[in-house]
Amino acid sequence: LSSYGDAAKKLDILKDPHCGAFAVIRLCSYFAAYFALCGCVAFTPRVGVLWTLALVGERALSGLAVAAFPLAKNTGLAHTFATAADRVRVRQVLAALCAMLAVGLTALGGWALVLAAGCVFARYYVVAKKQFGGVTGDLAGWFLQKCEIWMLAALAACQWLGVL
């Protein structure tokens, strides 16, 4: 994302198996933030159910994106999954699953998790389309990590504010 190159250059960077120093720094920062947020959350049975639904929901959103968003390239795992499936039917099923999970999360008091996931999903679409020309498997993984940490932050904030 930090490259000023065009979409083709950014896709080439994604293919590179080497890891740069700034990637390692960001990875360590991510782990520290995730660990800190996990330490802030009191995992009660209710929170355990919320978190389980949230993890299922983020993966359903990831699948929905592969089925609904444009693809950045004609190769790779995301392309394989998208072209091997009936995209319309997959979109319908995953959209229904996402809606049911959102209702379940909201009913348990996890509206902030739904809001966080929705915001990250919208950002995912904008970044994937604008910077890469569509979705790739690497971007799907990026979305999962972003979505998970933002939902964990929302969960921690709700507990801290006494909402949960």
Label every model-predicted segment.
Residues 89-108, 113-125:
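Hydrophobic core of alpha-helical transmembrane segments in multi-pass integral membrane proteins
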Residues 60-94, 131-135:
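Solvent-exposed interhelical
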Residues 126-150:
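Interfacial loop-to-transmembrane junctions
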Residues 52-68, 118-128:
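Transmembrane alpha-helical segments that form the membrane-embedded catalytic/substrate-channel core
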Residues 1, 61, 140:
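Active-site His/Glu-centered metal-binding helix of metallohydrolases
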Residues 1-46, 50-51, 89-104, 144-151, ...:
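Multi-pass membrane catalytic core of lipid/isoprenoid biosynthesis enzymes
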Residues 14, 59, 138:
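Divalent metal-coordination and catalytic microenvironments
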